[in-house]
Design a protein with these regions (language model features):
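N-terminal loops that bind phosphate or other acidic moieties
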Residues: 2-117
């Protein structure tokens, strides 16, 4: 399962770095940030490329920082043409829980359900 963290600024990069400090290096865990000099369209294009570069059959789970924020909206706009799971309001404990679920071979859907409980 590929996990893609998306945020305002460098929050997602810091989140990924912190998670890897806690649980070790992670494959298929990437971070994207929306910076003031970028447009939402540019971020959306990068995220779509990340989706398209994912091997067929591999699940994708997006983690975003803020409900209805621009990164959230960019991810949601991609749901029209792509199938993936999405959790918003992400923080370090939640991201660690996602990684632990991945270690336990849980599906993206199982991880999302567990977090919502």
């Amino acid at each position: 399962m590929k996990v893609i963290a998306v945020s305002h600024g460098s929050y997602s990069k810091g989140l990924v770095d912190s998670v890897q400090m806690l649980v070790g290096e992670q494959e298929s865990l990437v971070a994207y940030g929306l910076f003031p000099e970028q447009t939402v369209a540019t971020l959306t294009e990068k995220l779509e490329k990340e989706i398209n570069d994912t091997p067929e059959g591999e699940e994708i789970l997006f983690l975003t920082d803020l409900f209805h924020g621009s990164p959230f909206n960019a991810v949601v706009s991609l749901m029209r043409d792509h199938e993936f799971h999405h959790i918003t309001g992400i923080n370090i404990p939640l991201a660690v829980e996602v990684m632990m679920g991945r270690y336990a071979d849980k599906s993206a859907e199982e991880i999302c359900r567990g977090i919502m409980e």
